[in-house]
């Protein structure tokens, strides 16, 4: 594994920046949106990514989800291109595999919506009608 790969990719995850990687000594480049780095059940560091373009050993054309073993990444370049978490494509920060050994995970920047239930309100302040 590259000496500074974890730091570079963790920062890319935090900043929601795409990265270009070389994997397993292959010459071809893959462009991915890194969503999480975690330790799997075998104790290996894994990066979950949404690959948007570049080489695919399976021949399947991107885009698709793909895990990458950190120890097999031979080159990393952080790109200027940004991304939003792929919630509609299946990403969830609540997956069981992320609960232990999590190194970095993308934060969803979508607004949180809620409901106000009248039975759960509390009156505060003298500014309310009928208050002195």
Regions found by a protein language model. Give the residues of each.
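Core beta-strand-centered patch of the WYL/Sm-like small regulatory domain
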Residues: 1-132
